Regions:
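Conserved nucleotide-sugar donor-binding catalytic segment
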Residues: 8, 142-224
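Short, well-formed alpha-helical segments that are part of the catalytic scaffolds
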Residues: 14-27
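Acidic donor-binding segment of Leloir-type glycosyltransferases
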Residues: 26-65
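Glycine-rich, basic loop-to-helix element that forms the pyrophosphate-binding segment
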Residues: 64-83
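Short aromatic/hydrophobic "clamp" motif used to bind/position activated sugar donors
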Residues: 88
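Conserved donor NDP-sugar-binding/catalytic core segment of glycosyltransferases
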Residues: 100-134
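Catalytic core of nucleotide-sugar-dependent glycosyltransferases
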Residues: 142-151, 182, 205-213, 218-247, ...
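Membrane-interface aromatic/basic loop that binds lipid-linked glycans or pyrophosphate carriers
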Residues: 258-314
């Protein structure tokens, strides 16, 4: 197999872990890559950190105007526009690649050539780099409905940095799928990339996702989060009911299962937002705000009650 050029992109806003993130890329055992760092007009000194490196594979850009958390996917897609590699990954400024990440991806591509998307096994770490948990193992090959089913049943977690996607495919299909706050953007992007040919998964640990208090998924207005969920679930319903998608007997079984649990999964997501909001803003009165505004928020009394009950354990 010919040498593969990888594009590793970092849409950067936070500086705290950026040095470690860059070092993890430069320390790869496979060295044929470009590192694209896009400063989202951050108030933190991103440029000072990047300027410490003279590696010619690093390409630094800065937005004239901040995309912000709500429109963060715009930043992902701007990174994509700069990419020249055959495959691209988009990682957070606080995440890390394991040393053999790209080497393992070359092995996976060689074993399963011609796909539009590949997946890395991920460790979830805390702010100090301590292991919190390991992402679940996945079958080496699977189709779109198997992927969706695992997420709807809450048996999987995944992040944008888990995925390696063929650059030409992504550019030809509108880039990363945009939802406010990127809620569901990584999932839908992966599903669409796997729609025709499926995905190849590695069960070698290749990526580290860092959970911390400044992660986008922990921020944002509840109205925006609910808007994101509604848009994502609407698109997901269309995808699940797409009769044109190729599917064998197993995939057809997963498709039927996805159709049967979609509404329940959507309700669980809404209740999760309600629960987090009540827990963070006051269990004693916040549930009343939800009841008063339930029509505007398009949630039910049952959603609020179950969200409140869940918040008691937080």
């Amino acid at each position: 197999m010919n040498s593969i050029l990888f594009s590793i992109t970092i849409p950067a806003y936070k500086s705290t872990f950026l040095h470690s993130c860059i070092e993890s890329v430069l320390s790869q055992t496979y060295q044929d890559f470009e590192l694209i760092i896009l400063n989202d007009d951050s108030p933190e000194d991103i440029e000072k950190i990047v300027s410490q490196y003279s590696d010619k594979r690093i390409k630094y850009y800065k937005n004239e105007k901040n995309c912000g958390a709500v429109n963060v996917v715009d930043n992902w897609n701007k990174c994509l526009s700069y990419a020249n590699g055959e495959y691209i990954m988009c990682i957070g400024d606080d995440d890390m690649l394991c040393p053999t990440c790209l080497e393992e991806y070359t092995k996976l591509i060689s074993k399963h050539p011609g796909l539009d998307i590949y997946h890395a096994l991920t460790q979830i770490v805390d702010e100090n780099g301590n292991l919190k948990r390991l992402q679940e193992a996945r079958p080496e090959r699977e189709g779109i409905f198997s992927m969706i089913y695992g997420r709807l049943r809450n048996m999987r977690e995944q992040f944008i940095g888990d995925w390696l996607i063929r650059t030409d495919y992504l550019k030809a299909n509108g880039g990363y799928t945009k939802y406010p706050l990127a809620w569901g953007s990584d999932d839908m992007t992966a599903y669409l990339a796997a729609k025709d040919k499926g995905v190849a998964n590695s069960n070698v640990i290749m990526f580290q996702y860092r959970e911390n208090s400044r992660t986008i998924s922990t921020t944002g207005d509840v109205l925006i989060k609910l808007e994101s969920i509604n848009s994502f679930m609407s698109d997901l319903e269309k995808l699940i009911n797409d009769k044109s998608l190729p599917k064998d007997g197993l995939e057809r079984g997963f498709q039927i299962s996805c159709q049967s649990i979609l509404s329940t999964a959507e309700a669980i997501k809404r209740r999760g937002i309600i629960s987090d909001d009540i827990a963070s803003k006051g269990k004693a009165y916040r549930w009343l705000w939800w009841l008063i505004n339930k029509k505007q928020l398009n949630v039910t009394s049952s959603d609020i009650l179950k969200g409140w009950a869940k918040s008691l354990n937080k």
